[in-house]
Amino acid sequence: MDAIGVEARPPVYGRVIQWCLRFVGRVGHLWVENPWILGAFTIRLLLAWRSLLFDLSPRQLNRTIWSFISETARTFVPGLFVVLGLSVTLGLGTGAVARAVGPLLQPVFASVVMTVLLRDAAPLVLIVFMASRMGGIIAAKLGSVEGIPASESPVVSDQELIRVALPHLVAGTITGAVFFSLGAYCIVLGYVSLGDPARFLTASPDWFLELKPIQSALWFGVFKSMVFGHLVALVACALGIASRERGLRGARRVADVQNAVWETSVGSILVATLLSVLLWLAVEAPLR
């Protein structure tokens, strides 16, 4: 029996080839199919706006507004304490570094390091958090049976597409702006207090916020965070609904939803990083 089992086992090079083929398939799925899914979903969403603009009764308007509020609250409240804890920790750490460089180098630290931190680093850290938490939840919800009501059609209708996607897009945009504002304020407080916990809540950051480079960095950081939050929700809705439609057309597999959750996080971070580089090349680099 052992000899038969050994003979039936595929050779090592066969397993290596199978692993390489699975890896190539996963990479191709991430870099080829998912961008196509995202582009097609965006076009469908833009075309579906007609059903919202021309068939918006008062009852439907109230239901839509309430869905915006409820989805934003569900997205914002659970992550609030996590973002607050990370922001306070990052703020105190930034203040400790500013105190360590000394008073002579603190103006350079404020004009260079703080500007890059608020304008570039903080939005990217925020999208990693939002993609791993909010994006995964949206993709799992929309890809599951409970996410979208059952239908005989293998394609989600325009009305249903707007109904399930729009609240998540609005919630992602608002949550990105609010979370960044909270994090940026804690970072500024940490710098002004020089990392002293006793002065962290009593320090006044007004003089620091009046500096023009800091104001520009804050506004650009808010803009980036809103775009990134919207992007996370868009990718999650696209991959989640695509997984749902694959299940409507054929046998539903748990792996489809799992892949949608994983690829939402990875895809959102990749697209946001690429967009951040393009924004830096188009807007920030020419100003230097």
Regions found by a protein language model. Give the residues of each.
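Membrane-interface segments at loop-to-transmembrane junctions
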Residues: F68, D158, I162, R252-V266
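Short, membrane-interfacial amphipathic segments enriched in basic
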Residues: E7-S67, R246-A251
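Membrane-interfacial helix-loop-helix connectors in multipass membrane proteins
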Residues: A96-R119, V178-H230, L234-V261, E284-R288
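Selective transmembrane-helix segments that form parts of the transport pathway or gating/packing helices
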Residues: F76, L80, L84, M130, ...
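Helix-loop-helix junctions within the multi-pass membrane cores of secondary transporters/permeases
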Residues: V145-A203
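Hydrophobic alpha-helical transmembrane segments of multi-pass membrane transport/permease proteins
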Residues: P78-A100, S268-A282
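Long, hydrophobic alpha-helical segments
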Residues: L118-A139
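Helix-loop-helix hairpins and the membrane-proximal interhelical loops
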Residues: W49-T72, L80-F81, L92-V108, P286
